Amino acid sequence: MGGLLEPYIDTQKGYKLYSPKGWNKFESDPGVYDVKFQDVIEPETTVQVSTSPVATATSVSALGDLPTVGAKFAKSRNAELVKAEESDVEGSLVYTFELKGELYHELLALCINRGKLYRVTTVTSNKKWPKRQELYKNIVASFVPKGF
């Protein structure tokens, strides 16, 4: 990952991913995020991970099919749904969406595992997206929800 990323593991919340090296790290803003990484120079450029309990759903597919969920997120953010993909990460279905707003670009991943909804959100300006998209794709692709 070119030395730009380093491993981050949250054993209490049960996930791991690569995070940007040298960015500011903020722990838990309840109801908003569990951890946030923020670019030192461009504070609007962030990576956030949040978890919330789910009572009955065991898969992100319980939220709806991929296009429907993607369209809902795009509408709620007044953004265009550029791409929607699903993948299997160690037995858990993950939905990934690329959204483009008027001023920003967002890569978002959703997964339900062990009674929790996991959300990984990466945001940067549209101007910076061409330079940052590979970094963000690597971060989202590195996300693994599992017990430790």
Residue ranges and their predicted role:
Residues 17, 21, 71, 134-141:
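Solvent-exposed, polar/charged alpha-helical surfaces in well-ordered, non-transmembrane soluble domains
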